[in-house]
């Protein structure tokens, strides 16, 4: 699949990449819209983000789209569902999460890869931060 891959400081290349294989609890989403935010710009200028992305890696984290594939154990979703996903999910188990401060999570899971034809959403994000979209919400509006 075609993807925008971050290789380092101000170095993003359009490349053919292998589509990741689904693991337990994951879904594949065909990208409807992928947007660029201030964090993307900072990462592009710096060439990395200490916790979020290590080059080379498919870039982008704000997106919406349609589920095209699901691991066998995924429940509550179906192929063709329109969705938006947050780019992270807390662990729910660390001291910060248990104290209702998930933004400080010791094991915050980040998701990148929206600047591609499709993205695989990890199980924790599917469970905690994958949201359905009604048909009256456009993909660009949802990704915002």
PLM features: residue spans?
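Extreme N-terminal starter segment of soluble prokaryotic enzymes
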Residues: 1-2
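N-terminal glycine-rich cofactor-binding segment
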Residues: 5-21, 38-69, 84, 98-112
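Glycine-rich beta-strand-centered segment in the early N-terminal region that forms part
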Residues: 20-34, 48-95, 125, 134
């Amino acid at each position: 699949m075609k993807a925008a891959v971050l290789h380092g400081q101000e170095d993003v290349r359009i490349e053919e990449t292998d589509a990741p294989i689904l693991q337990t609890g994951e879904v594949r989403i065909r990208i409807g819209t992928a947007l660029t935010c201030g964090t993307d710009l900072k990462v592009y200028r710096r060439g990395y983000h200490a916790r979020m992305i290590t080059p080379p890696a498919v870039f982008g984290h704000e997106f919406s789209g349609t589920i095209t594939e699901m691991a066998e154990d995924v429940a509550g979703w179906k192929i063709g569902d329109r969705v938006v996903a947050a780019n992270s999910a807390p662990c729910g188990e660390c001291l910060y999460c248990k104290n209702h401060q998930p933004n400080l999570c010791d094991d915050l899971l980040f998701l990148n890869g929206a600047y591609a034809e499709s993205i695989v959403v990890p199980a924790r994000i599917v469970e905690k931060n994958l949201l359905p979209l009604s048909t009256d919400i456009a993909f660009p509006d949802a990704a915002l």
